[in-house]
């Protein structure tokens, strides 16, 4: 009986180890210094009650195990309850647009959280990060990694970063290269930071902007077939109204006095639509159990 293979890497005594889990009972099968063929049978499970090692036919699952509450199914989270309450349900094949203050912080947090195991609210995945406005912050990313006990240089190796200097470079990256790059890296999360960061030239013709953004939109729609996409709009731009409607989920953040106000736009009948929190808590969001 085959079991679940390599799930993630962890450092043990300063050395990288590959962790393998049993698909029957979630027990750790073993740690290895290197990976091995995922199609080969795994070692016997140490759990004597593991259903995969039971003799004879395996009993069919009970009816209650065939259906699960949505809240019990692992899904990607930012690990920051105030924002996670607005994002549910969050899954792949979605575009989430964050606009306003602190959205670059959210982008760095998401790029780190996506690398965590699924059981910890991550995607167990590499990340593709397109920087459209020179907004990436490796120091903040490293801070989030340290909060989770992850070596920053190890986490950074799982982020494929690319800087776009013109709107045409951004359009080419997203429409022609992004889907292939995400597939090559196995990235289940793609971050497009400051989508409109290069759309700030005063002589730009609006028809040309619409044409270029149309190419960006088509690239995002293609990518949504396999990945979750987070896009940010950190500063106001007259073309925001062309991008926000693309979103499956749109979150607007604004800073007033000592609080950040986050609102999910375009949603009614599902609470909460608005939350507030202290900005310093977001900088510590990688830590478990952050309170509002």
Question: Model regions: which residues?
Answer:
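Short Cys/His-rich Zn2+-coordinating modules
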Residues: 1-10
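Short linker/helix segments within small regulatory modules
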Residues: 13-14, 34-43
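Short cysteine-rich clusters marking metal-coordination/redox-active sites
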Residues: 22, 45
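Cys/His-rich microdomains that often coordinate metals
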Residues: 29, 49
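The Walker A/P-loop phosphate-binding site
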Residues: 54-146
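Conserved inter-motif catalytic segment of the P-loop NTP-binding fold
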Residues: 128-201
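P-loop NTPase motor core
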Residues: 179-246
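Phosphate-binding/switch region of NTP-binding enzymes
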Residues: 220-292
